[in-house]
Amino acid sequence: MEQSAPAVLLQDVKKSFPLGHGHALEVLNIASLALPVGSHTVLKGPSGSGKTTLLNLIAGIALPTSGRIQVNGTDLVPLPEPQRDRLRAAHIGYVFQTFNLLAPFTALENVMLAMRFANTIPRRRQRQRAIEILSQLGLKTRLSHRPAQLSRGEQQRVAMARALANDPPVLLADEPCASLDAATAQVVLMALYNICRERATTVLIVAHDTAALAGAAQVLDMREINRATGQPDGVEGA
Protein backbone atom coordinates (compact mmCIF):
# COMPACT_ATOMS: atom_id res chain seq x y z
CA MET A 1 0.00 0.00 0.00
CA GLU A 2 1.40 3.39 -1.01
CA GLN A 3 2.12 5.67 1.93
CA SER A 4 0.41 9.07 1.80
CA ALA A 5 2.49 12.23 1.59
CA PRO A 6 3.09 14.05 4.88
CA ALA A 7 0.94 17.05 5.72
CA VAL A 8 4.08 19.09 6.43
CA LEU A 9 7.50 18.45 4.91
CA LEU A 10 10.75 20.37 5.41
CA GLN A 11 13.95 19.52 3.56
CA ASP A 12 17.30 21.24 4.11
CA VAL A 13 15.62 24.33 5.55
CA LYS A 14 17.83 27.14 6.78
CA LYS A 15 16.92 30.57 8.09
CA SER A 16 19.43 33.34 8.69
CA PHE A 17 19.09 37.00 9.57
CA PRO A 18 21.56 39.55 8.15
CA LEU A 19 23.78 41.33 10.66
CA GLY A 20 25.50 43.62 8.18
CA HIS A 21 29.12 43.76 7.00
CA GLY A 22 28.71 40.43 5.22
CA HIS A 23 27.66 38.52 8.32
CA ALA A 24 24.45 36.66 9.11
CA LEU A 25 23.02 34.86 12.12
CA GLU A 26 21.75 31.37 11.35
CA VAL A 27 18.81 30.56 13.64
CA LEU A 28 17.41 27.51 11.91
CA ASN A 29 19.02 24.56 10.15
CA ILE A 30 16.77 21.53 9.79
CA ALA A 31 17.82 18.67 7.53
CA SER A 32 14.43 16.95 7.41
CA LEU A 33 11.09 17.13 9.19
CA ALA A 34 7.88 15.35 8.19
CA LEU A 35 4.54 15.48 10.00
CA PRO A 36 2.12 12.72 8.94
CA VAL A 37 -1.47 13.58 8.12
CA GLY A 38 -3.56 13.69 11.30
CA SER A 39 -0.55 13.56 13.64
CA HIS A 40 -0.39 15.55 16.89
CA THR A 41 3.11 16.84 17.67
CA VAL A 42 4.46 19.01 20.47
CA LEU A 43 7.60 21.04 19.81
CA LYS A 44 9.63 21.96 22.86
CA GLY A 45 12.92 23.70 23.50
CA PRO A 46 14.45 26.65 25.35
CA SER A 47 13.71 30.26 24.50
CA GLY A 48 15.57 31.34 21.38
CA SER A 49 15.86 27.82 19.95
CA GLY A 50 13.88 28.69 16.81
CA LYS A 51 10.43 27.32 17.68
CA THR A 52 8.40 30.38 16.64
CA THR A 53 10.60 30.90 13.59
CA LEU A 54 9.83 27.34 12.50
CA LEU A 55 6.07 27.87 12.89
CA ASN A 56 6.24 31.10 10.89
CA LEU A 57 8.07 29.32 8.08
CA ILE A 58 5.53 26.50 7.96
CA ALA A 59 2.73 29.08 7.95
CA GLY A 60 4.33 30.97 5.08
CA ILE A 61 4.54 34.16 7.14
CA ALA A 62 8.30 34.13 6.59
CA LEU A 63 10.46 32.46 3.96
CA PRO A 64 13.57 30.36 4.56
CA THR A 65 16.99 31.45 3.39
CA SER A 66 17.17 28.14 1.58
CA GLY A 67 15.42 24.79 1.47
CA ARG A 68 12.00 23.35 0.69
CA ILE A 69 8.78 23.63 2.69
CA GLN A 70 5.67 21.77 1.60
CA VAL A 71 2.28 22.07 3.28
CA ASN A 72 -0.69 19.97 2.22
CA GLY A 73 1.10 19.12 -1.03
CA THR A 74 2.00 22.71 -1.97
CA ASP A 75 5.54 24.10 -2.10
CA LEU A 76 5.44 27.39 -0.19
CA VAL A 77 8.77 28.93 -1.12
CA PRO A 78 8.10 29.69 -4.81
CA LEU A 79 4.71 31.29 -4.09
CA PRO A 80 4.35 35.09 -4.08
CA GLU A 81 3.14 36.59 -0.82
CA PRO A 82 -0.54 37.02 -1.85
CA GLN A 83 -0.75 33.32 -2.75
CA ARG A 84 0.89 32.32 0.54
CA ASP A 85 -1.65 34.47 2.38
CA ARG A 86 -4.55 32.76 0.60
CA LEU A 87 -3.11 29.30 1.23
CA ARG A 88 -2.61 30.09 4.92
CA ALA A 89 -6.17 31.42 5.26
CA ALA A 90 -7.70 28.31 3.72
CA HIS A 91 -5.33 25.50 4.73
CA ILE A 92 -3.37 26.53 7.84
CA GLY A 93 -4.85 27.48 11.20
CA TYR A 94 -2.50 29.50 13.42
CA VAL A 95 -3.05 30.17 17.12
CA PHE A 96 -0.73 33.02 18.07
CA GLN A 97 0.74 33.38 21.53
CA THR A 98 -0.83 36.85 21.84
CA PHE A 99 -4.27 35.72 20.56
CA ASN A 100 -4.55 38.70 18.11
CA LEU A 101 -8.31 39.03 18.55
CA LEU A 102 -9.98 42.12 17.08
CA ALA A 103 -11.16 44.22 20.04
CA PRO A 104 -14.25 45.88 18.46
CA PHE A 105 -15.77 42.55 17.44
CA THR A 106 -17.55 39.85 19.43
CA ALA A 107 -16.28 36.30 19.82
CA LEU A 108 -18.70 35.18 17.12
CA GLU A 109 -17.66 37.97 14.75
CA ASN A 110 -13.94 37.26 15.26
CA VAL A 111 -14.47 33.68 14.12
CA MET A 112 -16.75 34.63 11.24
CA LEU A 113 -14.23 37.18 9.92
CA ALA A 114 -11.68 34.39 9.46
CA MET A 115 -14.17 32.55 7.26
CA ARG A 116 -15.02 35.69 5.28
CA PHE A 117 -11.34 36.24 4.48
CA ALA A 118 -10.66 32.66 3.40
CA ASN A 119 -13.96 32.39 1.50
CA THR A 120 -13.89 28.58 1.58
CA ILE A 121 -17.18 28.16 3.45
CA PRO A 122 -20.46 29.44 1.92
CA ARG A 123 -21.64 32.65 3.62
CA ARG A 124 -24.99 31.13 4.52
CA ARG A 125 -23.14 28.52 6.64
CA GLN A 126 -20.53 30.74 8.26
CA ARG A 127 -22.57 31.94 11.23
CA GLN A 128 -23.75 28.45 12.14
CA ARG A 129 -20.24 27.05 11.69
CA ALA A 130 -18.82 29.71 14.04
CA ILE A 131 -21.50 28.99 16.65
CA GLU A 132 -20.82 25.25 16.45
CA ILE A 133 -17.08 25.48 16.93
CA LEU A 134 -17.30 28.07 19.72
CA SER A 135 -19.84 25.84 21.46
CA GLN A 136 -17.52 22.84 21.14
CA LEU A 137 -14.90 24.88 22.95
CA GLY A 138 -17.29 25.74 25.77
CA LEU A 139 -18.16 29.29 24.68
CA LYS A 140 -21.84 28.92 23.78
CA THR A 141 -22.80 31.59 26.33
CA ARG A 142 -20.01 33.97 25.28
CA LEU A 143 -20.82 34.46 21.59
CA SER A 144 -21.77 38.14 21.93
CA HIS A 145 -18.91 39.07 24.27
CA ARG A 146 -16.00 41.20 23.06
CA PRO A 147 -12.41 40.19 23.93
CA ALA A 148 -12.20 42.64 26.86
CA GLN A 149 -15.23 40.95 28.41
CA LEU A 150 -13.63 37.50 28.27
CA SER A 151 -11.12 35.82 30.57
CA ARG A 152 -7.69 34.87 29.25
CA GLY A 153 -8.79 31.26 28.88
CA GLU A 154 -11.91 32.30 26.98
CA GLN A 155 -9.91 34.58 24.70
CA GLN A 156 -7.59 31.68 23.94
CA ARG A 157 -10.51 29.47 23.03
CA VAL A 158 -11.86 32.15 20.68
CA ALA A 159 -8.42 32.27 19.03
CA MET A 160 -8.51 28.48 18.67
CA ALA A 161 -12.02 28.58 17.21
CA ARG A 162 -10.89 31.19 14.70
CA ALA A 163 -7.91 29.04 13.70
CA LEU A 164 -10.17 26.01 13.23
CA ALA A 165 -13.05 27.85 11.55
CA ASN A 166 -12.06 26.98 7.98
CA ASP A 167 -11.43 23.33 8.86
CA PRO A 168 -7.72 23.61 7.95
CA PRO A 169 -5.71 20.44 7.28
CA VAL A 170 -2.88 21.86 9.41
CA LEU A 171 -3.06 23.65 12.77
CA LEU A 172 -0.12 25.50 14.32
CA ALA A 173 -0.18 26.86 17.88
CA ASP A 174 2.55 28.92 19.56
CA GLU A 175 2.55 28.42 23.34
CA PRO A 176 -1.26 28.51 23.38
CA CYS A 177 -1.50 28.05 27.14
CA ALA A 178 1.53 30.02 28.33
CA SER A 179 -0.60 32.52 30.28
CA LEU A 180 -3.18 30.03 31.59
CA ASP A 181 -3.26 28.15 34.87
CA ALA A 182 -2.73 24.39 34.73
CA ALA A 183 -6.41 23.45 35.10
CA THR A 184 -7.58 25.85 32.38
CA ALA A 185 -4.73 24.80 30.10
CA GLN A 186 -5.78 21.16 30.37
CA VAL A 187 -9.42 21.95 29.52
CA VAL A 188 -8.45 24.15 26.56
CA LEU A 189 -5.93 21.73 25.09
CA MET A 190 -8.09 18.64 25.48
CA ALA A 191 -10.94 20.43 23.69
CA LEU A 192 -8.54 21.39 20.92
CA TYR A 193 -7.14 17.87 20.57
CA ASN A 194 -10.62 16.34 20.47
CA ILE A 195 -11.80 18.63 17.68
CA CYS A 196 -8.63 18.02 15.66
CA ARG A 197 -8.87 14.26 16.17
CA GLU A 198 -12.42 14.26 14.79
CA ARG A 199 -11.26 16.11 11.68
CA ALA A 200 -7.89 14.32 11.22
CA THR A 201 -6.19 17.72 11.50
CA THR A 202 -2.39 17.70 11.63
CA VAL A 203 -1.34 19.59 14.77
CA LEU A 204 2.00 21.17 15.69
CA ILE A 205 2.05 22.91 19.06
CA VAL A 206 4.93 24.78 20.66
CA ALA A 207 4.54 24.03 24.36
CA HIS A 208 6.19 22.66 27.46
CA ASP A 209 3.25 22.12 29.81
CA THR A 210 2.11 18.68 30.93
CA ALA A 211 -1.35 18.94 29.32
CA ALA A 212 0.11 19.56 25.86
CA LEU A 213 2.64 16.76 26.18
CA ALA A 214 0.01 14.31 27.43
CA GLY A 215 -2.22 14.83 24.39
CA ALA A 216 0.50 14.54 21.77
CA ALA A 217 1.56 11.40 19.94
CA GLN A 218 5.02 12.80 19.24
CA VAL A 219 7.32 15.21 21.07
CA LEU A 220 10.17 16.92 19.22
CA ASP A 221 13.02 18.80 20.90
CA MET A 222 14.41 21.75 18.92
CA ARG A 223 17.84 21.05 20.38
CA GLU A 224 17.80 17.73 18.53
CA ILE A 225 16.34 18.76 15.16
CA ASN A 226 17.83 22.26 14.78
CA ARG A 227 21.49 22.16 13.75
CA ALA A 228 21.96 25.94 13.71
CA THR A 229 24.84 27.10 15.87
CA GLY A 230 23.28 30.45 16.71
CA GLN A 231 26.62 32.06 15.90
CA PRO A 232 27.26 34.70 13.22
CA ASP A 233 28.84 33.43 10.02
CA GLY A 234 30.58 35.22 7.20
CA VAL A 235 27.87 34.90 4.57
CA GLU A 236 25.09 37.45 4.21
CA GLY A 237 21.64 35.81 4.40
CA ALA A 238 18.02 36.84 4.69
What is the role of each PLM region?
Residues 7-8, 13-223:
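ABC family nucleotide-binding domain
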Residues 1-16, 228-238:
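ABC-family P-loop ATPase nucleotide-binding domain
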